[in-house]
């Protein structure tokens, strides 16, 4: 147990820490003027996320501004797709667009195994530079999309409100979908191993759209592939803390705990205390302040952080939002979130 390691890494491993570490999902992004200025200069999202100099600069922007306890790679969950033979783009205000949606077994059979060091060397370069730059002041986080969510994008071809296309595949051609999900699980595990070998100290898997599944369908189409990713990564990197996030996860919290992850990232629609009562004690939590609260006053932000941390006291907890910070959030309120999070123990007393 070494206090020379970053606070977030120590907390994620379950060590006793003086306060909960704090970072924000999407902490590098449109709410920051410095990011918007750079976006105006480089309007292509793929260029910003795949040019190592730009990705590194953007990843470091919130660290320079707020000194969070975690610095996460600026990238996208779809970044590994071209390495498997699936082209995509991200259109401003429209979101991801898949050039040729996956709808047939021939397309699935044609997918390539992912070799991250060949198809995404820029990711490894950025993670290594981040690790060197932040030292022990912050933990470096890597991330991926989970198989179900990646499949939802590549089958639908874009973001969806009701996921009718992939659900039709799930219920009419389940063998096709299972083969696609299995391919993604193998590839995503390889990608996470590459991220860890390159410098990521903690990793998070986003299954953003698994909350659209019934509990029974979560057990069939999401959880087994989440678990496969976790199992494969833990075979080679057993000491790297693994976080799982699902938007709208209140109905499947107990199921998430069976996937082998170390920490469950909660959205804001479940009470922190109630969530902890439903989860085994060895499972840590991350979250879960409503990102909409950051449109409020600094006092309101502080009060909600205090309530969240007070309810999580005595458990492994990483303070975060329950979703990514929203575009248009006042930048000074992002600063207030970090400031209040770092000073929470001064207001509520000891964390342990």
UniProtKB/Swiss-Prot annotation:
GO terms of molecular function: uroporphyrinogen decarboxylase activity
The residues listed in the UniProt record as binding substrate, with positions renumbered to this chain, are 26-30, 45, 76, 153, 208, 323
- Sorted alphabetically, which keywords does the UniProt record give? Cytoplasm, Decarboxylase, Lyase, Porphyrin biosynthesis
> Which ranges of the sequence are coiled-coil?
none
Q: Where in the cell is it found?
A: Cytoplasm
Family designation: Belongs to the uroporphyrinogen decarboxylase family.
According to the record's subunit comment, the protein's assembly and interactions are: Homodimer.
PANTHER family listed in its UniProt record: METHYLTETRAHYDROFOLATE:HOMOCYSTEINE METHYLTRANSFERASE RELATED, UROPORPHYRINOGEN DECARBOXYLASE
Q: What is this protein called?
A: Uroporphyrinogen decarboxylase
Q: Which organism is it from?
A: Parasynechococcus marenigrum (strain WH8102)
UniProt lists the gene as hemE
């Amino acid at each position: 147990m070494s206090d020379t390691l970053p606070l977030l890494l120590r907390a994620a491993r379950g060590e006793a820490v003086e306060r909960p570490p704090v970072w924000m999902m999407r902490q590098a992004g449109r709410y920051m003027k410095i990011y918007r200025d750079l976006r105006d200069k480089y309007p292509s999202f793929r260029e910003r996320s795949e040019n190592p100099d730009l990705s590194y600069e953007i990843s470091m922007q919130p660290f320079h501004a707020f000194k969070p306890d975690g610095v996460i790679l600026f990238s996208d969950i779809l970044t590994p797709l071209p390495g498997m033979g699936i082209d995509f783009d991200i259109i401003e205000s429209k979101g991801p667009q898949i050039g040729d949606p996956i709808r047939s077994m021939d397309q699935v059979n044609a997918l390539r195994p992912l070799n991250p060091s060949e198809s995404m060397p820029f990711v490894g370069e950025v993670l290594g530079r981040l690790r060197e730059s932040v030292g022990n002041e912050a933990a470096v986080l890597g991330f991926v999309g989970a198989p179900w969510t990646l499949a939802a994008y590549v089958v639908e071809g874009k973001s969806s409100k009701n996921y009718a296309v992939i659900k039709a595949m799930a219920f009419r051609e389940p063998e096709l979908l299972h083969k696609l999900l299995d391919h993604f699980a193998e590839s995503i595990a390889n990608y996470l191993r590459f991220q860890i070998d390159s410098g990521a100290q903690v990793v998070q898997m986003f299954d953003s759209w698994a909350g659209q599944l019934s509990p029974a369908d979560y057990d069939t189409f999401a959880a087994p592939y989440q678990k496969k990713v976790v199992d494969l990564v833990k075979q080679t990197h057993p000491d790297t803390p693994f976080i799982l996030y699902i938007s709208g996860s209140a109905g499947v919290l107990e199921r998430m705990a069976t996937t082998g992850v170390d920490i469950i990232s909660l959205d804001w629609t479940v009470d922190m205390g109630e969530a902890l009562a439903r989860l085994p004690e060895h499972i840590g939590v991350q979250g879960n302040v409503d990102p909409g609260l950051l449109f409020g006053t600094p006092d309101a932000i502080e009060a909600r952080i205090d309530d969240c941390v007070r309810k999580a006291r005595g458990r492994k907890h990483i303070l975060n939002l329950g979703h990514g910070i929203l575009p248009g959030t006042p930048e000074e309120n992002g600063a207030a979130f970090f400031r209040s999070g770092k000073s929470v123990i001064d207001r509520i007393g000891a964390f342990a």
